[in-house]
Curated annotation (Swiss-Prot):
Cross-referenced PANTHER family: POTASSIUM-TRANSPORTING ATPASE A CHAIN, POTASSIUM-TRANSPORTING ATPASE POTASSIUM-BINDING SUBUNIT
Function (record text): Part of the high-affinity ATP-driven potassium transport (or Kdp) system, which catalyzes the hydrolysis of ATP coupled with the electrogenic transport of potassium into the cytoplasm. This subunit binds the periplasmic potassium ions and delivers the ions to the membrane domain of KdpB through an intramembrane tunnel.
The name this protein goes by in its record: Potassium-transporting ATPase potassium-binding subunit
GO cellular component: plasma membrane
Localization in the cell: Cell inner membrane
Keyword Ion transport: yes
InterPro entries associated with the record: KdpA (IPR004623)
Transmembrane segments: 5-25, 27-47, 63-83, 132-152, 170-190, 253-273, 283-303, 327-347, 356-376, 379-399, 416-436, 484-504, 524-544
Organism: Salmonella typhimurium (strain LT2 / SGSC1412 / ATCC 700720)
Origin organism lineage: Bacteria, Pseudomonadati, Pseudomonadota, Gammaproteobacteria, Enterobacterales
Keywords, ordered alphabetically: Cell inner membrane, Cell membrane, Ion transport, Membrane, Potassium, Potassium transport, Transmembrane, Transmembrane helix, Transport
Amino acid sequence: MAAQGFLLIASFLLILLVLAKPLGSGLARLIAAVPLPGVAGIERILWRTLGITDHEMNWRQYLLALLTLNLLGLGILFCLLFWQEWLPLNPQRLPGLSGDLALNTAVSFVTNTNWQAYSGESTLSYFSQMAGLTVQNFLSAATGIAVVFALIRAFTRQNVHTLGNAWQDLVRITLWILFPVALIIALFFIQQGVPQNLSAYQPITTLEGAKQLLPMGPVASQEAIKMLGTNGGGFFNANSSHPFENPTALTNLAQMLAIFLIPAALCFAFGEAAGDRCQGRALLWAMSFIFVVCVAVVMWAEVQGNPHLLAAGADSSVNMEGKETRFGVLASSLFAVVTTAASCGAVNAMHDSFTALGGMVPMWLMQIGEVVFGGVGSGLYGMLLFVLLAVFIAGLMIGRTPEYLGKKIDVREMKMTALAILVTPMLVLLGSALAMMTDAGRSAMLNPGPHGFSEVLYAVSSAANNNGSAFAGLSANSPFWNCLLAFCMFVGRFGVIIPVMAIAGSLVSKKVQPASQGTLATHGALFIGLLIGTVLLVGALTFIPALALGPVAEHFSLP
């Protein structure tokens, strides 16, 4: 089993790096505002048609453009969901969503969280899935990538005040990166058996003679961008454990690769844009180290089995509860770590049925800000926040003003860094406390004791960090939970983006200082270790008390 796990992890990372490197080169061209080969003429026509100028924006203008797009998308999506019954492509005549559920779902997909307090096949029409959710899957992913583009330019430019044109960045990211790659993935999914149609649900008679209604729909197209954009919201309630979303071992591998593809490629793009590829590789190695350790822990925990099931006479010595037999323990464990290391939230197994330690690792990966590869764009700008914190700590130890890529890190940058890093922990801890203090919050818990608290902590961690996965034992479709999690999702997304853009605006105007003998090298093993230590330290200090009340207490209560 150990050899199989090692081969699975190694082959996954090898294929990922092979695919990510050329994509990183294309992303680096977009960061430099250089059109990809053969599209310059098309872009000129697009700019004229859409009324987009070549005028570059400062950080406030860039941020305002992103906020305007997302708030407009939020309003439109809410209306689509609320008045769904009056809109076309609704063969099952599904009614509109309640106000609190429509708000929760709209915020969820606009913020790239894709938390789902509903069952897709019994709640949403094809029009809502296509014109509402799928569109936001593209736009929310493009928003995250645009933010990290602006931050990277802040490090690579000097003595200017502009970070690029947000509208041009969004169009280029969507048309030349997200759409073509998603199209290729969707065609592969269709070939593997994922449905792509607008047919009404199909009644069938099973081999046992029972009547059943098979859901249909444009699944493959939404599934592709769901994974590529680290969105995670499933067309069906069972998400990627459903055979219509994830039918084979090949689609399972493709989905995991799609989740990490752009986050890994952005590391290569960062190195190329900075003029020092070692800088991007250092971040990639730090992410990969934490990722491999986390996968190993989850695999080990799930292979040990569940003592309660073993005592009840379970056939398998490994923990197969909540897992698909076509994937098994190892692939399910890898998928769980991939989807929570990134801000994806798609699942091919029920995380609520993992062992105490096996479920704690995905929860912790979300709580540290999903900086281990992370979401498209958000993972890299989240890790760069920890880089700034790491060089600040190193500067304190050696008595020098901290620098990164030749830019001095001053008080303003550190204040914004601290604010961005502290936003989500405050939401998680205060939100979990509020839920546990109120009857409306506690009534949603399926299980008592430590596992019930873990369900609450996981849900708020998932929402605040824009992941979207859940310990499904929590009945979260209530006005209290819909409003609480919508607030956490919105503030967790834009409460980080705003200080990140402020950091970019401050750094872009600074001059690049030449390296000296006292400059800390930020691409060697020493700095990689310091960066990993910083991530672990912040995660440990912030969440160990809460984790001790949930998964840790549950683990030590096992027979």
